[in-house]
């Protein structure tokens, strides 16, 4: 029979499905039988077991509530336990009735439950009576305690009055003795002893007796009544009698009447003891009932256990029946499984293996040989299977196609070889072009670096010389000319920096460094506008700021780059505005911080507005500029994650808007010190080959108090370090005639690890250079640099303190030394040591005795003496001590430190004079 593979597989699957259906029907019948047996048993067993469990739980809860009822100490708890007992009793009766309906004998359990209920009702009534008694006890006890306290208070008042009278009598006795009236004095003394003091003792005894009664009543308890009731009653009786006797001796009739009235309440102690006695009897009765309840509950639990045993016996019979049905089903399923397995094996061998699997395996082997390259391999017999006949015909066609493909592949291989040779030639040409581009880029970078160095070096000479000349008082008449030289030099430096920034941006922005640090936006904007205010002098232009209140106090960003962009925008506004105003605004807009520069200048043509951010584009060539400012500002805004936009109306004005991400700073903003920094006594080594740069730098540092040794090459620097005293730091130029500055720095770092190295160069200092030299230099100072900035950077890198943090006012001491000489300062210091220092001991003594006026006088004298000798920090502490003599810190240590610093300064001056 010539059947297809599909029909043969369908026939095998149909037989397996029929076998599966038969097994399922037999298994379903067995499971249905087991389920019916289980249902018949569980419908009766499970509810019965649940009722038995609930009965046990209810009896346990009833016992628990009975125990809590006995210990109930308030009406709320008493009622709650009573309700619980009622609920559990009703639940037990309902369960017993349900079990009786199912054929169980519950007569004994019901009788036991009735007895327990009667006992619990009696127990509840006794607890209620006990609560009422305890309420009465509490009220009466409080009344007696309050009455005793009132008696004690009245007795204390009488005792105080008697003591006052005795004091007056005693004072009179002294007067009589002074007047020499001896007989009258003796009579008064007898009255004092026999009457006044005796009355004081009696009233004190009355007060103590009242307090004793009060304490005895407060300490009364059920346990004491049960143990020693007669003794307590006798003690209270004696104490009350004492109160009654002392009440009669009270002289004040009103007080005596009050005490008598209060004693009536105290005398009710016998009623209080009777209440405690009744409470004790009820507690004993309750204890007896509780013991009886435990015995009854034990009997009840025994009856319930017997009932549970009966229920479990019935359940065991039902489970045995269920196990027999389950075993019958298991044997049936096992037999069915064995028969099904044999039938399945027969179907798989006869239908699947002989008719499908084996012919397919032979055909697959033939196909594998064909795939391995044996194209002419013969195919096996198809065993009358239509699909295999079709595969044979297809493989013959495949042989023909393979031969044709082989021929076509040979042709393609020849074409690929030719194309590969052409591609290799193109790759070689591309590499050559790339190498030429890299050489051009390197040449451009080298040109910019050389240009920067060659321009910055003479520019440093121009700006430095102008600054030094401006400090010369003899050249005040030429100050405007020097200012013009400085402004021109700074403008040239700005143009150079713009060209370098544009070059870095054009190279892809890799060398454009953008920091991320906390800064204060308001001072940044105000100081930037203040710097531009000098350019509007004599011009009809008004500069204004408008900073919104929603601008945070501190933000995160690059304040230097932000200042650069805003300065560029303000410069453009000043360049294109002849009159009117320029407003610097700042506000927030959602998650952005906006800085706007709006002017009333000539405006920009809308057709050119889109081009102004392109390099070397100028609105008007008459206004000057390089045409790079807006390009650099726009690219810097993008580097900081923001954007720069502009709107303008011709003849009305323009508005440039800088948008930056609004990121509020969480870290504190570091405070910058803008005051002059003194470098007194600091030895510095300047390694610089340019003579003009040497001279200007040395003069700048000398004016700050530093001692500078200038060296022109690396060899002299090494020789100087070896033969001279140690230096605090070395300023190293990068371009030296004999050795590269970075190479020299590596050698100095190895030979003199304690020497601080600071870069001092006119090169382009980009992020790459900083990272490459960060392990060698504490920092890099770019040339040109103003004198104040040079001192501040050196102080920062050397971690020096500002001038105000020094103990001495060096400028004052220098002036005094020039006017009167150091010998006079030596004399002042000796007088200070002889006369002023002992004032410190006086301050210590006055502080110990809390004499603030003496401390103020001594602190005032010390403040004047310290101020005369230039001891600034010590003088400040003395002024603070004068204002707060008892709480301000003492100036002892600071004065000692200032004296030592002054002696060192004088010794240094003496050595310099020699």
Swiss-Prot record:
Sorted UniProt keywords: ATP-binding, Cell inner membrane, Cell membrane, Kinase, Membrane, Nucleotide-binding, Phosphoprotein, Transferase, Transmembrane, Transmembrane helix, Two-component regulatory system
Control of this protein's activity: Inhibited by TorC apocytochrome.
Periplasmic side: 30-332
Main localization of the protein described in the UniProt heading: membrane
Domain Histidine kinase residue range list: 450-664
Reactions accelerated catalytically: ATP + protein L-histidine = ADP + protein N-phospho-L-histidine
Entry-linked SMART domains: HAMP, HATPase_c, HisKA, HPT, REC
Domain HAMP: from-to ranges: 354-410
UniProt cross-references to PANTHER family, sorted A to Z: HYBRID SIGNAL TRANSDUCTION HISTIDINE KINASE J, SENSORY HISTIDINE PROTEIN KINASE
NCBIfam families linked: PRK11466.1, TMAO_torS
Reported function: Member of the two-component regulatory system TorS/TorR involved in the anaerobic utilization of trimethylamine-N-oxide (TMAO). Detects the presence of TMAO in the medium and, in response, activates TorR via a four-step phosphorelay. When TMAO is removed, TorS can dephosphorylate TorR, probably by a reverse phosphorelay involving His-860 and Asp-733.
Protein name: Sensor protein TorS
Protein's gene: torS
